Amino acid sequence: MRVLGVDCGSERTGWGVIDSDGGCHRMVAAGVIRTSPKCPFDRRLLEIGTALRGLIREHTPEFAAVEEVFHAVNAKTALKLAHVRGVALLTIAEAGVVFAEYSPLEVKMSVVGYGRAEKSQVQMMVQSLLRLPEVIASEDASDALAIAICHATHQATHEATSRRLG
């Protein structure tokens, strides 16, 4: 299965595409969609949606996974993040890609085995699980890959359970 993971942010939206059989994962591509804080917010949302649309067209994922909104200290930041997530989810849905949402705790549990893991621990496990020669430098791209791995693992478990139950 091919999975697109998205880690939303108003200035940096991480993305990562993996191929997976549920147990073995391979990175296809990863990166960051960057928008300027000097740009009007509506323009930044448009740039994020356009970039995601292009990534979906280029990599043709079967599934997409997006991290749920965490509880931010700053309400304005949380609201902006919610807008970015809305654009991401709409873009994914318009492309006909099945998507799922996972909390940061679920992603960390799935990838590291500990829901309160540090970012550096997540980065190291992403490197290990994808058999990469080095850690992904961008936390945003690494987080997006972790989200994709989380979904691939959940999807494989769901499919295996469905087969057993008939």
Curated annotation (Swiss-Prot):
One Gene Ontology term from the biological process aspect of the record? DNA repair
Q: Which domain of life is it from?
A: Bacteria
Q: Which CDD domains match?
A: RuvC
Would you indicate the residue range of the signal peptide? none
- Cell location: Cytoplasm
Matching Pfam families: RuvC
**What does the record give under GO molecular function?**
crossover junction DNA endonuclease activity; DNA binding; magnesium ion binding
Q: Which reaction does it catalyse?
A: Endonucleolytic cleavage at a junction such as a reciprocal single-stranded crossover between two homologous DNA duplexes (Holliday junction)
Q: What is its main location?
A: cytoplasm
Which parts of the sequence bind Mg(2+) 1?
7, 140
Catalytic center residues? 7, 67, 140
Q: Entry cofactor note text?
A: Binds 2 Mg(2+) ion per subunit.
> Which HAMAP family does this entry report, sorted A to Z?
RuvC (MF_00034)
Q: How does it assemble?
A: Homodimer which binds Holliday junction (HJ) DNA. The HJ becomes 2-fold symmetrical on binding to RuvC with unstacked arms; it has a different conformation from HJ DNA in complex with RuvA. In the full resolvosome a probable DNA-RuvA(4)-RuvB(12)-RuvC(2) complex forms which resolves the HJ.
* Protein name, per record: Crossover junction endodeoxyribonuclease RuvC
In the record, what lineage is assigned to the organism producing the protein?
Answer: Bacteria, Pseudomonadati, Acidobacteriota, Terriglobia, Bryobacterales
